[in-house]
Amino acid sequence: MTRCLDQIKLTLLFALIALALILRAQPSPAAGTETLTVAGGCFWCVEADFESVPGVIEAVSGYTGGTTPNPTYSQVTSGGTGHYEAVQITFDPARVSRETLLNLFFRSVDPTDAGGQFCDRGDSYRTAIFVSDTGEKALAERSKAEAQRALGQAIVTPVLSLGAFYPAEAYHQDYYKGKKLVFTRFGPKRQLNAYKAYRKACGRDARVRQLWGNAAPFAGS
């Protein structure tokens, strides 16, 4: 009997440790703010797009949707973790609504592509919206249906339950405005210039403009 009780206590201890790790991985939003977590291909681009939106406080690049705890960029892009490259957006709902952000999201990606985004192929680059409750799910599904009607094509972006969100390595945060010198296939460049060269070469904005036309919020001209 004592051995059984000890085993139960040990099992409960492991369960509590696992729960603590999951909660630790979730950034705590500031009072009066909300979060929206989306996957839209390269997280550098999604982060850059949404940090330009008035009412967005910050956007953090990271990984979610998979089973591997505390994954690295190399693990995620190599496959097998189940994680998406994702961005967690913290926003002030008094300044910008969740619905507005969802509408911007759909019009900033190719939601018809089930195999990745633009030049980035593979499961980790697929699109997705992650939700925490039934209200968020209903709103995301409604936004998806509206975007599908507007586009006139089937949208394959799933609406998934949000699990642990793991912030990506510091190197990836705010990459689009970084000043460090990096070596790329375009030669040595500052991060912000390497980002611009990558985004153009990947064809992100060209494809989004092709799909959404003037409704594309971040694609420029």
Stretches found by the model and what they are:
Residues 2-5, 13, 21-221:
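Flexible coil/turn and secondary-structure edge motifs
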